[in-house]
Swiss-Prot record:
Entry's Gene Ontology BP terms: translation
Keywords assigned: ATP-binding, Ligase, Nucleotide-binding, Protein biosynthesis
E.C. designation(s): 6.3.5.7
Species per Swiss-Prot/TrEMBL record: Oceanobacillus iheyensis (strain DSM 14371 / CIP 107618 / JCM 11309 / KCTC 3954 / HTE831)
GO molecular-function terms, A-Z: ATP binding; glutaminyl-tRNA synthase (glutamine-hydrolyzing) activity
Gene3D superfamilies in UniProt: Amidase signature (AS) domain
Stored InterPro entries: Amidase (IPR000120), Amidase_CS (IPR020556), Amidase_dom (IPR023631), AS_sf (IPR036928), GatA (IPR004412)
PROSITE patterns associated with the record: AMIDASES (PS00571)
Annotated catalysed reactions: L-glutamyl-tRNA(Gln) + L-glutamine + ATP + H2O = L-glutaminyl-tRNA(Gln) + L-glutamate + ADP + phosphate + H(+)
The organism's place on the tree of life at top rank: Bacteria
Any one of the GO CC terms: glutamyl-tRNA(Gln) amidotransferase complex
Ligase found in the keyword field: yes
Protein name per Swiss-Prot or TrEMBL: Glutamyl-tRNA(Gln) amidotransferase subunit A
Length: 488
């Protein structure tokens, strides 16, 4: 049995009782990475020497305090880490080896004495749904390496599923934590927009991006969010709202809980296996005293188009800073300064990033702004209003995280629109700004995980966690492990 089959709380007790050391945990993490990551490709950069040095320092401390004391974790490679290479999985930043500061979430993790083992693979600049847009080797799904892990936080989900680390951080702009969590059979939370500081997150779409945790269990997830959540003066979009004890919320049952199930989330396009898994999950909730009713989110059918217009427009502006002057790739074939800007960006960015920059620039251009960008903002408000109305009457919204289980590597790369449709059930949550979590709720006939998505009201992650935990404890799905490289 791997040490990483225990929860963070259980490992904390083992450390306290001196059954294990922090060095044991960190060594196990790297041993597992060296054993299986040549198949999974979850990590882009490792920090083994410094991590082991920190582990030994922590073992020497008499006061072993910290909510995540000694726990090995991984950081998505678009979250800045001081002195540790940060590439956003882009060749443009391949030589960005020494960032000058830590993101706020990294500072908070360090304050609780976690150990960062390395930086995780992703779709380039977080633009993608399969991790096939990585500027390096694409991450593979630990349950079947012929399948994708999801994206853009594919490395974050795959590393946890493969037992390489106890927890990871990802970012979620349109489903980039929840979708890979569903594909990899782990727990992934996108908090309320503003709940977690974005300072130090390389921006994709600033009005949609949110950092969140990926773990094997709901309890571990709640524990990590308690650490990283909270107001930050360095982020003007950070909400000054009190952070409750999410782990305390897990102790409450779901008797009397009112669940809304949008008919649009079980409509055509959602596979029968996924529908059946969701309906079975609803039966579990009924057995625990919760009730559910079918509802409608009528504007969700416009969410995909709205999202890609808005997110690409914001990306067009945010990625303008990557010009080859201060850091990153600089073309050696330029005739002048303007030519250098153009060629550096053309040579440094991958195809999907360039596609979205062009789409966003078009939507913001003179003559098209009102027809596209402004109209998309109005539709976003309608989508938000749909959620507000439902969440006034119900405690949570429940449905599938993805329309299907993980698809095969290369299956959808030739058709961007088909690829984009994978996020159709997660995107509305980002547009509304509400919290959402994905937890395992079954497996396909091919043995691939299926995810249950639970959506809550603004800053009410506690109810989302309570709902997720009740289901998790009533089922066994989260206890299954992929058979990878002689897996645990």
């Amino acid at each position: 049995m791997s040490l990483f089959d225990y929860t963070i709380k259980e490992l904390e007790e083992k450390l306290h009782n001196k059954e294990i050391t922090v060095e044991d945990l960190v060594k196990e993490s790297y041993q597992r990475i060296h054993e299986v990551d040549q198949e999974v490709h979850a990590f882009l950069t490792l920090d083994e020497e410094k991590a082991l040095e920190k582990a030994r320092e922590l073992d020497q401390l008499e006061d072993k305090t910290g909510i995540l004391f000694g726990m090995p974790g991984g950081i998505k490679d678009n979250i800045v880490t001081k002195g540790l290479r940060t590439t956003c999985a882009s060749q443009f930043l391949d030589n960005f080896n020494d960032p000058l500061y830590d993101a706020t979430v990294v500072q908070k993790l360090q304050k609780e004495n976690m150990v960062a083992v390395g930086k995780l693979n992703m779709d380039e600049f977080a633009m993608g749904s399969s991790n096939e847009n990585s500027g390096y080797e694409p991450t593979r799904n630990p349950w079947n390496t012929e399948h994708v892990p999801g994206g853009s936080s594919g490395g974050s989900a795959a590393a946890v599923a493969a037992g390489e680390v106890l927890f990871t951080l990802g970012s979620d702009t349109g489903g980039s934590i929840r979708q890979p969590a569903a594909f990899c059979g782990v727990v992934g939370m996108k908090p309320t927009y503003g709940r977690v500081s974005r300072f130090g997150l390389v921006a994709f779409a600033s009005s949609l991006d949110q950092i969140g945790p990926v773990t094997r269990t709901v309890e571990d997830n709640a524990r990590v969010l308690e650490v990283i959540a909270g107001h930050d003066q360095m982020d003007t979009t950070s909400a000054n709202v009190e952070v409750p004890s999410y782990t305390e919320a897990l102790k409450q049952d779901v008797k009397g809980l009112k669940i809304a199930v949008p008919k649009e989330y079980l409509a055509e396009g959602v596979s029968k296996e996924v529908k059946d898994a969701i309906l079975e999950a609803l039966k579990v909730y009924e057995s625990m005293g919760a009730t559910w009713e079918e509802v409608s989110l009528p504007h969700s059918k416009y969410a995909l188009a709205t999202y890609y217009l808005l997110s690409s427009s914001e990306a067009s502006a945010n990625l303008a800073r990557f010009d080859g002057v201060r850091y990153g790739v600089r073309s050696e074939n330029a005739d002048n300064m303007i030519d250098m800007f153009k060629k550096s960006r053309s040579e440094g960015f991958g195809e999907e990033v360039k596609r979205r920059i062009m789409l966003g620039t078009f939507a913001l251009s003179s003559g098209y702004y009102d027809a596209y960008y402004k109209k998309a903002q109005k539709v976003r408000t309608l989508i938000k209003n749909d959620f507000d109305k439902i969440l006034e009457e119900y405690d949570v919204i429940v449905g599938p995280t993805t329309p299907t289980p993980a698809f095969k590597v290369g299956e959808k790369t030739s058709d961007p629109l088909t690829m984009y449709a994978n996020d159709i059930l997660t995107i509305p949550v980002n547009l509304a700004g509400v919290p959402g979590i994905s937890i395992p709720c079954g497996f396909s006939t091919e043995g691939l995980p299926i995810g249950l998505q639970i959506i809550g009201n603004y800053f009410d992650e506690s109810t989302v966690y309570r709902t997720a935990y009740a289901y998790e404890q009533a089922t066994e799905h989260h206890k299954k492990r992929p058979q990878l490289g002689g897996a645990k």
